From Swiss-Prot:
Residues 1-22 are annotated as: Disordered. This is Small ribosomal subunit protein bS20. Belongs to the bacterial ribosomal protein bS20 family. GO terms for biological process: translation. The lineage of its organism: Bacteria, Bacillati, Bacillota, Bacilli, Lactobacillales. Keywords: Ribonucleoprotein, Ribosomal protein, RNA-binding, rRNA-binding. SUPFAM superfamilies: Ribosomal protein S20 (SSF46992). The keyword Ribonucleoprotein applies. The keyword Nucleus does not apply. Binds directly to 16S ribosomal RNA. One of its GO terms (molecular function) is structural constituent of ribosome.
């Protein structure tokens, strides 16, 4: 347990950031799972809408530093490949 005032504050902010990041990553994973489920069920109109949502979620995560920009690009490429099948 930290004793210094600034260290105590830092622990509080780290915990808040950790919760926020976990929530954002969960939203990202959910968007990707919804898209993949739509691809498996072959619902064309849902696929295009959910593809946009998944790509948007990846871009947001990359811009916030939750995932690396190259991982976002790789995942977007894979999702687009699935959408075009």
């Amino acid at each position: 347990m930290p004793q210094i005032k600034s260290a105590i504050k830092r622990v509080k902010t780290q915990n808040a950031t950790n919760k926020r990041n976990a929530s954002e990553l969960s939203k990202l994973r959910t968007a990707i799972k919804k898209f993949k489920n739509a691809v498996e069920t072959d619902s064309k109109e849902d696929v295009s809408k959910l593809h946009l949502e998944a790509v948007r979620a990846l871009d947001k995560a990359a811009s916030k530093g939750l995932i690396h920009k190259n991982k976002a690009a790789r995942d977007k490429s894979r999702l687009t490949k699935l959408a075009n099948k």
